[in-house]
C-alpha cells in the first residue's frame, strides 16, 4: 500500500464516519419536532422523518445524484444516470458510492426540516409526495449550482461569477443549500396549509400551543449538536495531511462556538424581552447558531464564528415572533426561522466575516455580492418550486386533513396507532 492509498483510505473512513454522524441527526430532528408538538401527533411526526430518509435514500441514488453531480453544458442541471455512477469520478479519488452516501444524508436533512413546520395538520399521503419531489428535483438542482460544479460555484476565469464579482459563491456545508432550502420550503408549506385550529383568535392574536415534551426536544437538540460535528467538519471530505487536519480542527471549533453563542444569545434575549429565559427558544437558538455558521465555518475566525452565532440567536427570537404574530404563519417548531432566516443570515455573513476576502477584512464587496446573488437564486428556486408543489397539491387533492382528524389527532386517524398507550 502506497502513502497515497493510505491517505485516500483515511479520507474515506473520515467521510463515512461523518456520514454516520449526519445520519444520526435524523433522530435528533425527530425528537426535537415531536417534543415541540402535541402528543396526539407524535407517531405521525416521527413517521415523517423516516419517510424522508427512505424516499431520499432511493430517489437520490436513482436520479437525484445525477441531477446534482452529472455533467451539463450550462451549469443549471446535471444529467440523470438512473443508478449508474460510472460517469462520476471524485477529484480526490474518494469512492463514488461512499460519496453518494455522504450526499444522501445531506439531502435527507434538507427534506426533514419541512416536517416540523407542517406538523399536526398535513395529510400523510401528501407529505410523501413532497418528500419525493425535494429528493428528486428541488434539492439536487440547487445543489448542482453550488456543489455539483454548476454556475454559482464556477471559479474559473471567464465564468459569470468571476467576471461579475471576482468570487464564486461559497457554502461550505449547507447554510444555503441544505438549511435555507428546507427553511423556505417549510415557510411556503406552512402558508399553503394555514394555521392549526385555535392558533389565532377572532381578534387575530396568536395563541400558544405548547409542545408536549421538552425532554424529548432537548435530547433532540443535543443529538443535532453532536451530529453537526459530522455535518460541518465532514464537509472537508479529507482528514489526511496537515492542511486537512488543521481545517477539520478549525471547523470543529467554529461550529461549537457558534452553537454556544447562539444558545446564550437567545437565552438572554428572551430573558430581557419576556421577563424569563425561555428554554424552548434557547434550544432553537443553539440550532440557529449551528445553521448560521455552516456556510462559512471554514473561512471565519473563532471570534467571527461566535459573532455569527450570537447574532443568529438574537435574530431568531424576533424572527419567530414576527412570522407568528405579524405574518400569521403557524410554524410549530420554528423551522422557517431556524433554518430559513438563519441560513440566509449565515450565508451573507460569510461574505462579510471571511478572513480571506470578507468585506470587514478589507476584501471589498465582491465576495459579499456573490453571496447575496447565490442565496437569492437558491431561495427563489425553493420558494417557486415549493409554491407550485404545495399550492398545486392543495388545489388538486387537498393538503390538509379534515377538521375532526386535526382535533382528535393524526396518529389514530392517519396510522391507526398511538405513540403513547
What is the meaning of each model-derived region?
Residues 1-421:
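Glycine- and aromatic-enriched membrane alpha-helices
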